[in-house]
């Protein structure tokens, strides 16, 4: 009972993280609050991977919904035996928590790549990735940010928002990983038997 309540609390934490991921990803389409750059496709290419909107956002909301349903006491009657039902619920919980790790992990990786690549901006040489060849060193050298002439403050905009996405998706990965460990501990530590019985399956 205690582990189930704990699992439900962890699942609930995923909801605000997913909603914030959607909001932050949407903001990446509007550097400095302007819409013209999205319509003219003058944004960093990693924005178009929809890492925050789709994977760390919508897909995580779906995963969270399933996990919360599985935590409901009334959903332990999927077969004749209560023990059998618990086994299937545990298995499904592990599967969907693992999917959560995959979805949020995707957002984490893409956001990190977007952060290291730097923004797509207008320089004296035209529109380009001004810091693409710096291997992320520009992140700690604010003196070279002036190379980006347009959009205004786009370097800060990208750094802040991609960093937030990395944090949000990282927390999602941790929460889903904890859920997997909790469910596996039920099996390995013998909270209930997971030996399949021929007469049940």
UniProtKB/Swiss-Prot annotation:
Keywords: Membrane, Transmembrane, Transmembrane helix. It is a multi-pass membrane protein. It holds the Pfam family L6_membrane. The keyword Mitochondrion does not apply. The chain crosses the membrane at residues 10-30, 50-70, 94-114, 158-178. GO terms for cellular component: membrane. Residues 1-9, 71-93, 179-201 are cytoplasmic. It is found in: Membrane. The keyword Transmembrane helix applies. Residues 31-49, 115-157 are extracellular. Belongs to the L6 tetraspanin family. This is Transmembrane 4 L6 family member 18. It comes from Homo sapiens (Human). The lineage of its organism: Eukaryota, Metazoa, Chordata, Craniata, Vertebrata.
């Amino acid at each position: 009972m205690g582990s189930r309540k704990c699992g439900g609390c962890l699942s609930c934490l995923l909801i605000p993280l997913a909603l914030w991921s959607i909001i932050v990803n949407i903001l990446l389409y509007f550097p400095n609050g302007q819409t013209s750059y999205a319509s003219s496709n003058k944004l960093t290419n990693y924005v178009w991977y929809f890492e925050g909107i789709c994977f760390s956002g919508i897909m995580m909301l779906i995963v969270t919904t399933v996990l919360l349903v599985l935590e409901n006491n009334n959903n332990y009657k999927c077969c004749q035996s209560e023990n059998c039902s618990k086994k299937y619920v545990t298995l499904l919980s592990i599967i969907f928590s693992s999917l959560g790790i995959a979805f949020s992990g995707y957002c984490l990786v893409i956001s990190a790549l977007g952060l290291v690549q730097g923004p797509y901006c207008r320089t004296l040489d035209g529109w380009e990735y001004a810091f693409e060849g710096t291997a992320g060193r520009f992140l700690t050298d604010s003196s070279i940010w002036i190379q980006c002439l347009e959009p205004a403050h786009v370097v800060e905009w990208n750094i802040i928002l991609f960093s937030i996405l990395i944090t949000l998706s990282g927390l999602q990965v941790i929460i889903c990983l904890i859920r997997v460990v909790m469910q596996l501990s039920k099996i390995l530590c013998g909270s209930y038997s997971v030996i399949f019985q021929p007469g049940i399956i």
